[in-house]
Amino acid sequence: MTYEEIAEMMEEMGLPFAYHHFAEGESPAPPFLLFLSPGENTFSADNLAYFSFKQLDVELYTNRKQPELEEQVEAVLAQHEIYYKKTELFIDSEELYEVLYEMEV
């Protein structure tokens, strides 16, 4: 997926979003999404790179547990036939829940 295709998919999730972080002072009230590509995995053989998979993280931030929003995000990922690993944590300093979806695209 290209950056543009990923951004279009993020639009489908129906929440404010940004790549990596919002500019200082521009962060919306929760819920919101962040996405980032922390790296790539390359398939290679015989000293040739045949294909590269982008790592993609989609982070859902909420001020309370909201399973319906998680389902909304997961429905979009399913529409795009994207397999993901899901984890969750509470960020004490921000008083926010983060649901992290890790995938390769």
What residue ranges belong to the model's regions?
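Long, contiguous binding/interaction regions
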Residues: 1-55, 61-105
